[in-house]
């Protein structure tokens, strides 16, 4: 029982179920029901064999035996729930619990033999259900052999009563400790979380008692578009008295008009479905609150994403993309900062957020023994899809990800690409308001990848999609705005075209000259574009030599009319020895590499400055 519950935690299955709308009390109710069926089966088998075989101690007091066995079985269910809170690894839980079962059985027997043969156990011993059960079996065997003294009858009543008390203690302890214990995956509650309804009532429906968030700790090298986005979110936060939006979906922030074209939201009528304000995540290297080995995964991320938008979050490995999504989806608790999704505060209203959330995690989280259809049906029910629409919804999802022919196959028998499509289908099921897609097309072939792009594009209207990917082509094709992260910070922000113009190396004209006519071709291009810059001497190809000229930018760009340039090239290219030519715009890959390299240089500079500071401190000492 314990191992299965821990396995769901370890493999993030429980976390994904929560993200898809499962309330924890329903989760524990399902665990109790399933484990109760298992223990009831074994208990009934034990009773049938014992009573049918006329075992002496069972035949003498059958009613007491049945009550003892069933109460003990039920107490073990709640004890298993409590024990599962303290484990993160399935193997460890199995080994430790197997050992503890033996210890409890031996301890109860040894205590009875050594000291309590003819007198009652102290009642507090029975807070441990296995000890109470062991003692109860001893008393029953003693009754069968020598009769039941009055102290033994009273002790048996105490045992039965304490087993009931144990169930209550174990249940509430499990629910409370599970809520407040720090989790490997998921956000724990504060110790007094159960007083939240009282606080809400006293504060007139609001839980937000924090002071306005600080605007400090701004990167001195922050990009202008990132600064505009931060100021936009600050304006919204200041308008609400220093708190993120919370309370209901209708309270999501309205986007004021932005003067920065291509970077922040452009329409004053659209809602921000995601507001992230100074979000920060630090992985501690030790037990102390701060140490030199701390790793800052996300550094003061301030961002707003609106409805009807597919936002691309790019960056090299370790940039903080997946960590940011993990915080937004409640998988990791932020070290500091605030965020709201669909108008609900991430710190206090995650249950409401989960009802409106769809998640495709970076790595597939699936039950290998379920079929594709069963998996989608399960999550459709979690999302509250009406019963009469379940079959229709599942069939639509199967068609969308092209898995209709494999719907009866178990997940464990699918290829990695097919499992990825199942994860994408799960994120889209139930019509969520905001969808997080963490590298959704990893491992897919080109044709399937294009189909998934179409599916994601169709899902964009009336909702917000946050996409991370290492494919610049995918980001270009799907995303209205793109943000690039490096070393935990948001380095740039804007539409694909805006970023290409701002960080790209300018438009380029590639032209191929016939062998021996390279200089004539270059002279022709220089005549047509006097302010252009030839990039290199040329690259030898099979049919000639390819050269590249960078077109002028800024004020000089106005002197180059592309329509006239194309007409002149059509007229003069052949006479100048130019075989073919093509205009090439900056790619997102160029922008990505430029941002990544600049961030590396900046990071090396910071490390060098830190080293110099340490050296000066050592010299001063």
What are these model-predicted stretches?
Residues 424, 452:
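Hydrophobic anchor residue at the start of the ABC signature
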Residues 329, 337-345, 352-353, 357:
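Conserved ABC transporter NBD signature motif
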Residues 435-438, 444:
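Catalytic Walker B motif of ABC-type/P-loop ATPase nucleotide-binding domains
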Residues 1-13, 24-25, 29-211, 518:
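Membrane-spanning alpha-helical segments of multipass transporters and channels
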Residues 377, 381, 389-406:
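Conserved ABC ATPase "signature" region
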